[in-house]
Each structure stands twice: as C-alpha cells, then as structure tokens.
C-alpha cells in the first residue's frame, strides 16, 4: 500500500509510485466454503480502501448474509460490504457494470475462464482461481499408513466437494498399488455417511440433487469405460458402505467409492 521509490533512476531523476483504491470490487464465490472464501476476498479489498460486493453461490446464500450483518455490527460504514444474490444473470450484471473495477473468483475451471474472459473484454481486472483437484504420487518406500490417512481425509472429507480434494492416487509399482488398494478399501468401507452435525459421521451430503446425479454419473461412466470399481458408493445399505442413520434416505447422500485401473 505504500508504493515504491527509486532514487537515481536517471541523471537527476527519482521515480516513485503510489497505490490507490480501485473503488468498487466484487467477489464471486463458491458454495463449499461460504464464509472462508468470501473473507479471503473481502478482507484485503476493504483493507485497501475499496467497497466490496459479494455474489455468493445461490446454493447456500444465508452465510454471506450473516457475514454482512457481522460487518455492520462491527461498525463498517453502510454500503462498504454488500451481498447480491442470484445466478449467472447476477454475475453477468456485475461483470458488465461500468463502476465495478475488479473481480475475484473461486470455483470451477470453466466458470473461471468465462469470468476472466468477460472481465477482460470489459477492460476489468480479475483474479480467477479455477479447478484445483490434486494428485498424490505414492512411492514404494512411502509410509502407507500416512498415505492412506491423507487420501481418505482429502478425498472423502466434505464429500469431496472442495478444491483441496485428492481425487487421484498414482502408486509407483504394482506391489505398491496392491498394498495401497487393500488398505484404502478397508478404510473406506468403514466410513460413515450422515448429517454434517453428527459427530459420528465422517462426511455429510452432497450440496444438491444435481450434484448427487452428477457423481452417480461419474461412477456409472467409470464402470462403462472399463475401470475396476473396488468400492461402490451407490449401494445404500449394502456391505460396501454404512449410513449412520436410516432416516437419511432421500437425502443427497452417496457412499465413498474407489476405482482401480483407471486409464
């Protein structure tokens, strides 16, 4: 925020730069971390003297509203932090508004590319973080207990709906692969799916019915395309998985799944 000073840039020439607020900036954030990611965007923007407009995911709109209430209770000036609800129509209105100077986005790669392109076409700055699923390479001398703990926590925590999820493990060597697969399958079958506030549940539901349909479709496609389905999370009530509560039938729940020999 202090800018820079370069003395002696040329004979009798000193160069300095100053930084000033842009004015109004916007954050377009995903459903999976409805408080943390908006605060990533809003905090620096407000600290640098900008007004901030938050467009949260329409899948969980209530948490951002509570953030706005907390900012107001803390004494933030009226209008400095605002929340706009909506879907693509709201996003396009923000991207095209002449008074909004910059955007921050976290979400899927396709939407990141869309927002970046549309903002650039309007001469706006944007910072777009899209698609961050991780891979784990498991070497023959790896601590498999530690590797399995990391894979189970990262792959299935939050029902896999987070950018830090490790969705692919690449074991080096057939022996490593066989040992890793056996340990993973054993651990995965013991995972309990249930209400997110249930302390006995390892993870909760997917965010929407559409998400459940999409994930089931991924499993169906894997089977159709020839991958080996070691643990089938589609089987409710079977030995493949355990639901913590039968009353959860009809919710957006799916058990943990594991594929092998994916090409």
Protein language model regions, located:
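Rossmann-like NAD(P) dinucleotide-binding subdomain of oxidoreductase/dehydrogenase enzymes
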Residues: 3-148
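ALDH superfamily catalytic-core signature
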Residues: 96, 102, 110-263
